[in-house]
Amino acid sequence: MSCPVPACCALLLVLGLCRARPRNALLLLADDGGFESGAYNNSAIATPHLDALARRSLLFRNAFTSVSSCSPSRASLLTGLPQHQNGMYGLHQDVHHFNSFDKVRSLPLLLSQAGVRTGIIGKKHVGPETVYPFDFAYTEENGSVLQVGRNITRIKLLVRKFLQTQDDRPFFLYVAFHDPHRCGHSQPQYGTFCEKFGNGESGMGRIPDWTPQAYDPLDVLVPYFVPNTPAARADLAAQYTTVGRMDQGVGLVLQELRDAGVLNDTLVIFTSDNGIPFPSGRTNLYWPGTAEPLLVSSPEHPKRWGQVSEAYVSLLDLTPTILDWFSIPYPSYAIFGSKTIHLTGRSLLPALEAEPLWATVFGSQSHHEVTMSYPMRSVQHRHFRLVHNLNFKMPFPIDQDFYVSPTFQDLLNRTTAGQPTGWYKDLRHYYYRARWELYDRSRDPHETQNLATDPRFAQLLEMLRDQLAKWQWETHDPWVCAPDGVLEEKLSPQCQPLHNEL
């Protein structure tokens, strides 16, 4: 028998088995964010609000997205299903038009059915609406993404509106910032990262609650995967400014919950959808494209506040975590035929009590933009990362906003002119990749020495390939037989050879 949360709680309260106040959950999401915060030891940037949240959180050092692309990542974290299973193979908007399958049971859908009030403020970027319904929604679908995703005063007021109209039900609020995403391709008047939007300068408008912070390009910390050039440093400095705006927005959102008297009843999670938009970052399944910040703050689990977890966790774990927080079971259902859907992620709540031994995470990417078909699958087991490039005969595709970025244009110009690039790779090896890439990050943290053909690692390679294939079968991956076979479920074996010399 199903029982809505408030009704069940009323009954259990009489029996002394239910909390007098409902639990709530707040998910804060950065857009193309990385480790630009004091909480993750970046001393060049000021992020006091994220740092304060980290002191009340368990900080995960080995958290990864399962896909390094905006819509697929958001769909995956809101369903607990990898992109190849939920159907969001690429970007949702405009000509790309990817959508999750109609029968997918998303987190907001399951929460709503269980009596939890749901809200979203900011960048949604997933569909269809029937799969991702929210009771309260202010997104790019009914307003300006700049206003609901970057104007932190507007975001603050929308959070207040959500809380003021709150009824007796517990709530799940999803605040999806548009910072620090690039905007030089779409709104160049606001700067490469929209760092000028709302800064009070002529024609830029003014965000009342934002105190802009400017950074000297000479002072930024250049990650190993970003060219150490003036163009890239200027890009990073602009990115820092928008990270600062988001950080102040995080502080405003948390203050609204505090003022409403619900912060101490609310599970707060902060993370990002994918890696930063720089070479080897977003759209890649390397470490820079998949490693994410992850802060989990539970008012009921202060034991590990301020601690660091080394456990390997995935954004696929967020749906089971939030369902666990609300004590809502995951249903048994099928999307196609009789294949029952099972979550491969796990609840992170046990990690808030004691350090777990979790050591494996998986990745799956098929598209970004509709023209960027470059399916990749990956598994990371402790410090070993295996990447399978299914279209390895083709050059790796570059997305539009990254292509026109100052960093990449400078890299192209330096490469064609034969000048030093200040980069740890070269474009030829970036474009053309081996089918299998195996890296030992304990000895090769920059992932430059491919061990896949080294006979000393043959047994490890086989083990990781088996792990990856097992996960692909469990998650009903249509690409499981590619590139040298075709999936035919009515035959045995189901992977039939193509004899294509691969």
From Swiss-Prot:
Chain sites annotated for binding Ca(2+) = 31-32, 70, 273-274
Any one Gene Ontology BP term:
determination of adult lifespan
What PROSITE patterns does the annotation carry? SULFATASE_1, SULFATASE_2
Q: Which residues form the active site?
A: 70 (nucleophile)
Q: Mutating residue 74 to C: what's the consequence?
A: In MPS3A; intermediate/severe; the mutant is enzymatically inactive; rapid degradation rather than decrease in synthesis is responsible for the low steady state level of the mutant protein in cells; the majority of newly synthesized protein probably occurs in the endoplasmic reticulum
Q: What is the effect of changing residue 106 to R?
A: In MPS3A; shows 3.3% activity of the expressed wild-type enzyme; rapid degradation rather than decrease in synthesis is responsible for the low steady state level of the mutant protein in cells
Q: What class of enzyme is it?
A: hydrolase
Residue list for modification 3-oxoalanine (Cys): 70
What changing residue 477 to N does, per the record, is:
In MPS3A; uncertain significance
Please describe, based on the UniProt annotation, the reported consequence of changing residue 245 to H: In MPS3A; severe; common mutation in Western Europe and Australia
Q: Which reaction does it catalyse?
A: N-sulfo-D-glucosamine + H2O = D-glucosamine + sulfate
Q: Specify the effect of residue 456 to H.
A: Does not affect enzyme activity; cells transfected with the mutant enzyme contain a 62 kDa precursor and a 56 kDa mature form as cells transfected with the wild-type enzyme
Q: Which residues form the signal peptide?
A: 1-20
How is the protein modified post-translationally, according to the record? The conversion to 3-oxoalanine (also known as C-formylglycine, FGly), of a serine or cysteine residue in prokaryotes and of a cysteine residue in eukaryotes, is critical for catalytic activity.
Q: What is the effect of changing residue 79 to P?
A: In MPS3A; severe
The listed outcome for residue 150 to Q is:
In MPS3A; severe
InterPro entries in alphabetical order: Alkaline_phosphatase_core_sf, SGSH_C, Sulfatase_CS, Sulfatase_N
Q: What is the effect of changing residue 235 to N?
A: In MPS3A; does not yield active enzyme; the reduction in 62 kDa precursor and 56 kDa mature forms suggests an increased degradation of the mutant enzyme
Give the principal location in a single coarse category.
other
Phenotype upon changing residue 377 to C: In MPS3A; severe; does not yield active enzyme; the reduction in 62 kDa precursor and 56 kDa mature forms suggests an increased degradation of the mutant enzyme
* Xref: CDD domains: SGSH
Q: In which compartments does the protein localize?
A: Lysosome
Q: Specify whether Calcium is a keyword of the entry.
A: yes
Per the UniProt record, the associated disease is: Mucopolysaccharidosis 3A: A severe form of mucopolysaccharidosis type 3, an autosomal recessive lysosomal storage disease due to impaired degradation of heparan sulfate. MPS3 is characterized by severe central nervous system degeneration, but only mild somatic disease. Onset of clinical features usually occurs between 2 and 6 years; severe neurologic degeneration occurs in most patients between 6 and 10 years of age, and death occurs typically during the second or third decade of life. MPS3A is characterized by earlier onset, rapid progression of symptoms and shorter survival.
Kindly provide the name given to this protein in its UniProt entry.
N-sulphoglucosamine sulphohydrolase
- Which species? Homo sapiens
